[in-house]
Structures are given as structure tokens and as C-alpha cells.
Amino acid sequence: MQGTVAGYSLRYWLTLITGLLECLLFAGLVFGHASLVFVLKKEEYFGWLCVDTNSTMDSKDCSGQDEQFSLVFTVASFLNNFLTLLNGYIFDHCGTRMTRLLAIALFSGGTLLVALSSPEFSHLLYPALSLLAVGGVLLLITNMQVGNLFPAHRSTIITFYNGAFDSSSAVLLIVKILYEQGISLHTSFIFLTVCSSIHVARTFLLMPKTHIPYTLPENYTYGTNCGKGNTDTVEETEIKECPPTQESPETENTSLAPEVQSFGSCVKSRFFIFHLVWLSIMQLRHYFFIGTLNSMLNRLADGDSNLVSQYTNAFAITQLCGILCAPWNGLIMDRHKKKPLAPGEADLRSSYLSLLLTALQCLLFSVCTSIAFLPLQYFTFVLQVLNRSFLYGGNAAFLSIAFPACHFGKLYGLVMAVSAGVSVLQYPLVSVVREYPFYVDIGLIFLTLLAFIHPTNVFIHCRKQARLRKEHPETRARL
């Protein structure tokens, strides 16, 4: 029996570590946009949009080229979020294996299209980066459930995976460095396409066919076993629909038989609406920054390509720190786990500090971005990766805390899909920022202030629930 338990533990750890590597090396490639654009400009993708200026023969106006690259990223980031609603539905209803096979097909198609693209077929970048984005986020969605294998550290693992997702953008820095050493863009992306075979093997060996339940049954196992096992039997016991577990964290109903929230009531709750505003505003700030980073660096460096390359490398290197920053947020959200609090209360009490810190980071990041001083951008890069790690890790962790687990895929998909509509605003802002960069930055700073509504609401709710428990101690077990 001891050997069996050790076998389960080993499989859990292998799943955790390989999932972390998968998110770190593949899932968030599309967010290495700045490094990729540097290479694509050298290859003269959309080069026909650069026109000679009247001042000197050697000077060219490439604003049209910059707009095309920004639009490629806008479309990819929009689909990355918007289709997450459909992806969440597929994950909830079709299970892990089918969802991962779809993700691998999309991701492989994206890397293959980049490998087959050329300056003459620059528009292949639109479907290529879109497929990379959608396939990558699907891989992330299927991996976040791994936190259920380690209940005491669930939020930490979820944020850790999201941090790895952010850090994977640095892979395109490696592609950029290899390109400068003589290895072509096409060779690098063919290699990434071949690596998809590793994802297929992990899908069958180290991931469940359906879902990893929360809470975890005793001796739970999954994947392909070498010999007769009870994997199928164990997985058939997983919850197929929402059980009557607990009410909404916002509810004050003292009924003796509380029922789980419906999906509709989750969507209509203040928690969800304010969380959507919180995510949408800060995501727009980050997408706009990434999409315009190359043109901003060119403007601040007065067109010095060596300086632009230096700062692009610095930005990509800081993205590697995402995997180190994200667990801090998870530790904040898990810090009350061992305290004698009511179910769900510990998580909510921890979450408002995480939400507040994330909004504060974004505000400081927006202020630094608005200052037209090139050396300051090193600090801006650090703030950006820290805030982005907190943002996406905190988003997934809060949804898993505040709402029933059986709605996680749909709610995660919905919040990402709606926020995608807001992120489309980055494209018209690109046209405005060329003429009025300072005013756009100031507007985004004031917009960021709206993100503070969400942590304030959660804090007030927790204080209210604490007061109710003091007045009615008999309701503690039901809150």
C-alpha cells in the first residue's frame, strides 16, 4: 500500500513539473511579440509599407509597417481571450484529453504557418499568431487544474503556472538571439512544431481523460498505466455536474440546505462584474504596452537600432522573471489556509490583499510608462512582468476561490472573452498615440484607478461577513 501511495505522489509531481515546463516553454509564445517583431523587421515583413521620407534618402517612414505588426498582435490577443469562452466550455464538457489534443493541433498549426511564412506572404502572420495564442491558452487552461492535486497549495500552483505562461514569451528572445547567430526563423519554428509530439505524450501519460476533481478522492490516479489499474474507475467517479456544496460568497442566506450557485447567478454577482472590470482595464494597459513597445523604443531611442535591440532584449529577459514573481501572489492567497476559518473564508480574506496589490502595481507601471525617459524603461519592464504575473495568476485563483469549481472553465472563458472586447481598443489607441502619446498615457492612468473598485468590494464583503458571524455564531459553518 505504501508503494502505491508513493506511486501516486510521484505521478502527481511529474504532472506538476512537466506542466510547468510546458507552460514555460510553449504556452505564452505570442506575448514575445516584441522580440519577434525585431526579427520580422530584419526579414522585411510588410516591408512595402515603409516609404522614403523627403528629408534624406536613407530615412524611411515605417509607421504603416508598425501598424500592421500591432494589428497582428491585436487580433491574436483578442482571439486569445475571446475564444477562451468556447475553450472553457469545451474543457468543461469534453474533458482534458480532447481539449489538449485540440490545443496541440492549433499550436502546431501556428508554429508551422510562421515557419512557412515569408515577406511575400506576410499576411500569414495573422492566422499563425492567432493559432499560437488560442492553442497556448488552451494548454494553460488544462494545466491549471493540476493545483487540485495539492490542495494546501492550490492558489500558489495556479499562479505559478500563470507566471510560467508569462515567462514563455522569453522563448522568442532565444529565437531572436539564434537568428542573430545565423539560425533562421523558419528553422526555429519547425523545431517548435516537432516539439508538439512531447505535448501529445504528456496528454496520454500524465493527464486525466476528464478532469482532476476538487476535492481529491483517496488514491486518485489518472493517465495510462502499465498494467491493469483502476484509472477508468477512479475517473468515472469525478463530478459531472455541480453538487450542492456552498452558496455564493456574496449571499447572506441562512438556509439550512444551501445549494450551489447556478452559472447565471455567478455571472450576475458583484464579484464577477467587478472582477471583469478589474481584469479588463489592466489587461488593456498591458496589451497596449506590448503591442506598441517596438515603436515606443524607436521613438525614445531616436531610431537607434542597436539601442532598440538592447532594450528589446532587456524586456524579453525580464519576462523570464514572471515564473518567479507569480508564486508570491499565490503565497499571499494561501496564507490563511491553515487557520481555523469557515470554508472559503480564508481564501476570500487573502484575495482582497492580492487584488489590491495588483491594482497598485498597475498604477505605478502606467505612471512609469508615461515618462519619456529611456533608462527608466528598465524599471518599467520589471513592473510590467511583476504586475502581469499577479494579474493573470490572481484572475484564475480568484475565480477558483469565489465560485463553484464546476463553473471554472466557463467563467474563466467568459471573463477572458469579455475582456477581449475591451482589449480591441488598443488598435485605435495606436493611431492616437503617434500624435498624442502623453495624453493617451494619462488617460490610461486614470482608467487604471477603476481597478481599485474590486478589492474594495471584496474587503467590504469580508468585513460584513465577519460582523455577521459575531452577531450570529451559529451561521459560521454555513458561510
Task: Place the predicted regions along the sequence by residue.
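Central cavity-lining transmembrane alpha-helices of secondary-active solute carriers
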Residues: S70-Y89, N313-L331
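Hydrophobic core of transmembrane alpha-helices in multi-pass small-molecule transporters
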Residues: S122-L139, L376-F390
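Glycine-rich segments within core transmembrane alpha-helices of 12-TM secondary carriers
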Residues: L132, L139, N148-T203, F315-P327, ...
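Long, low-complexity inter-transmembrane loops of multi-pass membrane transporters
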Residues: M207-I273, V277, F288, T292, ...
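Conserved MFS/SLC helix-loop-helix module at the cytosolic interface between two early adjacent transmembrane helices
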Residues: F82-H123
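Cytosolic juxtamembrane N-terminal segment immediately preceding the first transmembrane helix
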Residues: M1-K42, F46-D66, E247-E250, T254-F274
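Extracytoplasmic gate region of multi-pass secondary transporters
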Residues: L29-L40, F263-A326, Y392-A396
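C-terminal transmembrane helical hairpin of 12-TM major facilitator-type secondary transporters
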Residues: M333, P340-N395
